[in-house]
Amino acid sequence: MHSSLETTAPATLERRESNLGDKLILKGLKFYGFHGAIAEERTLGQMFLVDIDAWVSLKKAGESDNLEDTISYVDIFSLAKEIVEGSPRNLLETVAELIASKTLEKFHQINAVRVKLSKPNVALIKSTIDYLGVDIFRQRNTSSKN
């Protein structure tokens, strides 16, 4: 049986990401939110883990040693915190998409963003797991002129 789906090997994804250049990395962000498809998740809440990679040229900041020439990690952290701790959503996909789209919208210097969003405690699974989550990559549309 043949599938019409194409897959990309992890090594190919890593090469594609490395072609994007420099990146800011925020790893292991922890927030408490009320997202989930079942009522208990939306009323009791739970911990969410977030990793964000933001591709942006760091050359000018590296040469100038001036915060004005880069994007503050605190600003990206604050945006993610506001979304995860904000209005409840049914799906992790929606929360990750909001983080990615708002990051690209707010920080015009960022060319692409990768958001990994996970929850280590899943109410529907009565077994030990590290986490369940989503990993999305969004790239700025370079064909449109603003």
Curated annotation (Swiss-Prot):
Entry keywords, A to Z: Folate biosynthesis, Lyase
Catalytic activity as recorded in UniProt: 7,8-dihydroneopterin = 6-hydroxymethyl-7,8-dihydropterin + glycolaldehyde
Active site: K119
GO BP annotations listed: folic acid biosynthetic process; tetrahydrofolate biosynthetic process
Entry keyword annotation includes Iron-sulfur: no
Keyword Flavoprotein: no
Enzyme class: lyase
Organism of provenance: Arabidopsis thaliana
Protein name per the record: Dihydroneopterin aldolase 1
NCBIfam families attached to this UniProt entry: folB, folB_dom
Encoding gene, per UniProt annotation: FOLB1
Protein family according to the UniProt entry: Belongs to the DHNA family.
Stored InterPro entries: Dihydroneopterin_aldolase (IPR006156), FolB_dom (IPR006157), GTP-CH-I_C/QueF (IPR043133)
UniProt function note: Catalyzes the conversion of 7,8-dihydroneopterin into 6-hydroxymethyl-7,8-dihydropterin, a biosynthetic precursor of the vitamin tetrahydrofolate. Can use L-threo-dihydroneopterin and D-erythro-dihydroneopterin as substrates for the formation of 6-hydroxymethyldihydropterin, but it can also catalyze the epimerization of carbon 2' of dihydroneopterin and dihydromonapterin.
Pathway, per record: Cofactor biosynthesis; tetrahydrofolate biosynthesis; 2-amino-4-hydroxy-6-hydroxymethyl-7,8-dihydropteridine diphosphate from 7,8-dihydroneopterin triphosphate: step 3/4
